[in-house]
């Protein structure tokens, strides 16, 4: 089954959910209709596992802008399959969870699920794109849909702030990504990702390789909340909990990691890439794990834990990047192990972190708070969530018999492998191992700290907002199913790695099925070795620190002096002040000022173009025949135009302006263009009448006398504009070697069936221009409608 059917099916479901916005009786079912989308996607990707295992890729391509190699090009490979299954299967759980979380009466269900579907569609688009520009389009669509979902409760100031902050950071990162993709196109001449991966060595030798790599890293780090771009993720927790469980733990924040996995065969050829990604990941890991301990909000703890876990995965992506330089031998086996560990932990993290977010959402929904200072003793009210969150948190901490233990062991194995690889030198390698172990200890500490503060201790009824607390079964079901997966993966890990991780590894390493021979076999017991010793140290030290130390007091003092968020706010306010000054300087409500700026910029661009390429070779200048009438009209237009500069009376100015317009119409008539003359006459008549009628609405403000200095400037600018236009006409006349585009439009009848060439141009050849012009008119009309129906609401909140 082609990818087009999957994408088409998702679009149809989105349209049906959109229809429920306007059909009141169907609004309550919007969530269940939307649930069909992740179910459909899950079924599709599960059905493709046998094909991908046998090396068969599902491909689909429609030309879009083939001249610049921008096409609707989709390709499902092993890496895309793994991410597609995570997005769709976690999506089934989250969509069902959201139907129980949101209120039919209070929340706009169609709007929420439409945004969620748009996000899922965009995320799937990223992982199956085989064209860099197409991937960028979906990349920015995830930012837009994330903005809409975070600001879903738009009356909440925190939601607005979180949405704006995440949008600014991720969109700027997206622009950096686009810059990197453009550089790749300059280097190779193609935007097709599968072709780019075959040219990795020639790309790495190009002068633009390092700038391109930096741009791609900025795009990945901003999307995956890596230090110092992590600040948007905690603020995004203002979104409804289903959004946090889906976007900000399991899917969207993995997009940057997906990008680096995808381009590892190219980027891994640089040692700088390995250094940057590894150390950024480890710094993010330890920063997130320490910062999680100063949070009182359960979602805040999970936000920083997500940042920490993403850093852990990112460090493995960086360490394993050396596979691009060593595709065979013992080193290839070690790099393969590291990349395998990163992919395996990515899957495990999606499961246990989504379960944790769902548990927190249920507590918040039923108890009315997420503040751990008010939630002690919750085990008696939420026994199922106590079990779910305990298993999920301990899995994240790396406790045996849970899936997180296996991938944490492989992470430690990766750190130990760094010693064997001698990638960083002995000193840096020791630092790498130390950071990884210390960050893992803090991961254990905040996992136990979260459970202790929420479920242990005595319940205080006075601190909890809601008095009738219960734990609905349907609400808990998705989290329970995810919890069950945690020990299952521990006991049968190779079933999942062989069907998901291994196909993805083939693409990440770019070795194909030959990587199967060196891929690791996951075992629950490897004997007593260094990774196991690290795990024991983490558990023992973590327990002592979690139970004996007051982390809230310590971390608050340490981190408050180094707040990245405050730096972001200062930079944001600085840009806001600067942009305000610029806008006030440019937008001074003087139309002639706007016209002068526009004319000067237009003329400067023409002058710059002439300076760069020079004027065309001068041929004989042909002047059209003209008679006395043309000369009289030309003199009259010039005289009236100069007079307009000095006249102050409004009515006189409008009449003189009309005279110029009618004179131009006569010019068209003399040049044998009656249709243009008629159009000019109609437009000039209508605008003149509108000007005169509008005078009755304008205030009777005395007009100042003409200022010769200002009027002289206007005359000079007018001559500059006239010179620019004449120059363009001159250039057009000298372009004898260039074929005129007007000949193409003579095919109007054959290509469009239209007998009127103007209609054919507007409706076919320039259809997009016409459509967007119509959209502009609609937007302008909506603005006018709003102004006409505006009511004075001073003293009220401007957003109400």
Swiss-Prot record:
It comes from the Bacteria. One of its GO terms (biological process) is monoatomic ion transport. It is a multi-pass membrane protein. The keyword Transport applies. GO terms for cellular component: plasma membrane. Signal peptide: none annotated. Keywords: Antiport, Cell membrane, Ion transport, Membrane, Transmembrane, Transmembrane helix, Transport. The chain crosses the membrane at residues 3-23, 29-49, 78-98, 109-129, 133-153, 167-187, 202-222, 249-269, 273-293, 300-320, 337-357, 387-407, 428-448, 472-492, 527-547, 596-616, 627-647, 651-671, 676-696, 712-732, 768-788. It is found in: Cell membrane. It holds the Pfam family MbhE. InterPro entries: CPA3_Na-H_Antiporter_A, MrpA_C/MbhD, MrpA_C/MbhE, ND/Mrp_TM, Proton_antipo_N. GO terms for molecular function: antiporter activity. May form a heterooligomeric complex that consists of seven subunits: mnhA2, mnhB2, mnhC2, mnhD2, mnhE2, mnhF2 and mnhG2. Belongs to the CPA3 antiporters (TC 2.A.63) subunit A family. This is Putative antiporter subunit mnhA2.
